[in-house]
């Protein structure tokens, strides 16, 4: 495969994008670019510094003056903010509840998009997010839109939290996911939207390996063209 073969995986919160993207990248020997972790990182940093999350300009300045680094690790992607490892810190309920708001600002979106495009430009990479196929990499070689019911997505997130020893409220998660769907789909800048040329995969009753195999088949199909 030529350099710069990109796989874009989009979908709503809890559809299994990160897990699937990570495994797909592993199987292909591609770089995995965790765009969700990038938005979580700036959300965590803004909360830690007491920055108003409604102030797009202040958030844009925070991103400009900070160093955000992603590194491959055995557990997936390690996230560093100004040299500090914040991989675990960005997965809290507080970050979950605020990341859509932070990501809705044009200043944040533009800064992150430029970073992601730069990372993917010269590499074979798998990226997952909300607007990869429509906005970040509209020319991605393979585009996939993962979806699943709100109930199933909340169940997965609930189990994930419990496995990590974090407190979790299933009913609250359902409400949070439904609210996040609405925020992500209706924001003015790069809303969550299925690309016209994306393959839709409903993961509600599928296992992770099954979803990964479906995507690998799409990549093989594209490579044969």
From Swiss-Prot:
A Gene Ontology biological process term: pyrimidine nucleotide metabolic process
InterPro entries the record matches: Cytidylate_kin (IPR003136), Cytidylate_kinase_dom (IPR011994), P-loop_NTPase (IPR027417)
Domain of life where this protein originates: Bacteria
GO molecular function, one term: ATP binding
Pfam families the record matches: Cytidylate_kin
Enzyme superclass (EC): transferase
UniProt key word Repeat: no
Catalysed reaction, written as an equation: CMP + ATP = CDP + ADP; dCMP + ATP = dCDP + ADP
Keyword annotations from UniProtKB, A to Z: ATP-binding, Cytoplasm, Kinase, Nucleotide-binding, Transferase
This protein's name: Cytidylate kinase
